[in-house]
Regions:
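Surface-exposed repetitive/solenoidal architectures
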Residues: 1-449
Length: 449
């Protein structure tokens, strides 16, 4: 999908405009061997998405995108330009049936954003994000846009002020809930207003239980940046639960002097911020040689972002985690071996589980150096009774009983070689699954495996 969008009001994507529609259970692109792309430039107002340019009172659910995205900028200044994997522009109308919902979406595609001649940093700027570009509502509507349980793994390379893992700008009446960003962002723009979940929360916008694990690396001058959000911009705004675990890097001074923080850059106007984890780290870019702040349990509130003494009482129950928090999940062959050993011994598996208790792959796993594989859930059947159409089996030892999400990644060069001398012994990547779910996993490959 490649286009030069000339003129006003252009939309572009697999779908241009969704109006009262539903798109679900769709995968676009693939981890490898796929040449899909979304690349466009604009000369006027434009909204583009891999799935849809504009989502108007519609639902996009349970979809995955691997498609790399690149907006080359807008040749006209002060013209809204949006790009994201699922909806460039998200809009709710005046009726209850005109609500837009994005849920259970995963983006793996890289995100590259350039400004062109558009130098603005507000609603009429260039926006790029993993899930949606900008959300808004009809001026007479009181209904809410919803982005729920969405994840971005796409790496972000940006030269514009507004780029985020989930939603570049929650302009009005939007709830972002249970979303996670794992993508890192390197941004060279001056005067950024970057947040890794969203850049701004406006009127009647709430963020609930959202987590950022990506690093925000701002290389330009006067770059405002927050681990979750840059600007809280309305007295109705709420941020509850979740937290930041990524680095926040910019040459701008850290709070309280400047607009940079583990949670937000600027706590300007809001109703409450409660029960949020202030993890990760804060530092100056310093030409690439980071100079990190020393953040402790005694001073961590000084580094969550800039807020006034009048607003301090609305910021409650902030939880300090410090830096170097490891992203939970399986990232290497050794991680997979260790996870199997933990399941088989009955030990804790929390090091490989996300906040929902799901065991997740963080990337492709190459098992070429593992000569012998011991299954996850290495139990064996101890007896069975068969009669008629009934069969009752019993096993002893370990079984995997949880949820394993491959996140679309693959396990390759897995050598499953066994001598099953004991009767009714189970063998595979998993030995015995008991009440478990295994999903979104590729084993092997067409070539090189």
């Amino acid at each position: 999908m490649v286009a030069d969008l000339e003129g006003e009001g252009k939309v572009f994507g697999l779908f241009g405009i969704l109006d009262g529609a539903t798109v679900k259970n769709l995968t676009i692109g693939a981890p490898e061997g796929d040449a899909s792309e979304l690349t466009f430039s604009a000369a006027g107002t434009a909204d583009a998405g891999v799935v849809a340019g504009a989502c108007m009172g519609s639902c996009i659910e349970n979809c995955v995108s691997y498609v790399p995205m690149y907006v080359k900028g807008n040749s006209v200044d002060n013209k809204r330009t949006t790009m994201a994997a699922f909806a460039g522009f998200m809009y709710t109308g005046v009726e209850e049936t005109e609500v837009s919902v994005l849920k259970d979406l995963v983006n793996y595609g890289s995100i590259k954003v350039e400004a062109g001649a558009n130098t603005k940093n507000g609603a009429t700027s260039v926006h790029g994000a993993g899930i949606a570009g900008l959300s808004n509502r009809h001026t007479e509507s009181t209904f809410i846009n919803t982005i729920n349980n969405c994840v971005n793994y796409g790496e972000m390379t940006s030269a514009v002020p507004r780029t985020s893992g989930i939603l570049a700008a929650a302009n009005q009446y939007t709830v972002i809930e249970s979303c996670k960003n794992y993508g890192n962002q390197t941004n060279s723009a001056a005067g950024t207003r970057v947040g890794m979940i969203t850049c701004v929360l406006g009127g009647q916008c709430h963020m609930r239980d959202c987590e950022n694990y990506g690093d925000a690396i701002m290389t330009g001058a006067n770059a405002q940046v927050g681990g979750l959000v840059c600007l809280l911009n309305d007295n109705s705004v709420e941020v509850t639960g979740g937290g930041n675990y990524g680095k926040v890097i910019s040459d701008i001074d850290a709070s309280p002097a400047g607009y940079k923080g583990t949670l937000a850059a600027n706590f300007s106007k809001f109703a409450k911020v409660d029960n949020v984890v202030a993890g990760g780290a804060v530092g100056k870019y310093n030409g690439g040689e980071y100079v990190m702040e020393t953040i402790t349990e005694d001073n961590y509130m000084d580094y969550i972002g800039k807020y006034s003494s009048a607003n301090a009482e609305k910021i409650t129950n902030i939880i300090f985690k410090g830096e170097d928090v490891k992203t939970p999940g399986i990232a290497t062959a050794q991680d997979l071996i260790d996870f199997a050993a933990a399941v088989n011994s009955g030990a804790s598996i929390e090091n490989w589980q996300d906040a929902q208790g799901t065991v997740v792959l963080l990337n492709d796993i190459d098992m070429k150096d593992v000569a012998v594989w011991t299954p996850i859930g290495n139990g064996k059947f101890s007896g069975s009774v068969s009669g008629g159409n009934q069969h009752i089996s019993e096993y002893e030892g370990a079984a995997f009983t949880g949820v394993f999400d491959g996140k679309g990644y693959s396990i390759r060069n897995l050598k499953l070689v066994a001598d099953l001398t004991a009767d009714q012994t189970a063998y595979g990547l998993f030995g015995i699954l008991d009440g478990a779910t295994v999903m979104n996993l590729t084993i092997g490959a067409p070539e090189g495996d």
